[in-house]
Amino acid sequence: VCYTIENKNRGSTTKLCGAAHPNNGGLLLKNYFSLSMQPREINQISALGLAHCGDAVFELLVRSWLCDSGKLTTKQLHRATVSYVCAPAQAARADRMLPLLTEDELAQYKRGRNAHVHMIPKNATHEQYSKATGLECLFGALYLSGRLERINELFVLTMEEPHAD
């Protein structure tokens, strides 16, 4: 079922397609905030494709975490976000996350870590960038499989400050 929505103010139209809702015949759009892909579907996506998605997931979590942690100016929010999502910081978090991973999660992490990337930012080593890509690949796979609680658990545990023993 497809519907055409006309925006009279802008003079444009948008075509929306989805399944007809069984109760009222209305349009039921796919919810991209709540996906539940099967492992075989996720394995068909390249490691860098998963990392692309996971990069956005991780950044959204960092931004949410920063907004929740107190009042900061937009400039402070931006600088803090950049400091947490850069490859060296993600690599450090990946190192802290590794002991917490299941066998399947570790396989997804390694898939991303071992992916061949063509460009590495100047502020990161090859090893740091590979670890960051592994973290992003894992977060992308977990997000697409609908395992949001697990993403949150890993995120919270890796954002805690390390304890000096």
Question: Each predicted region: which residue ranges?
Answer:
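Double-stranded RNA-binding/processing signature
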Residues: 2-165
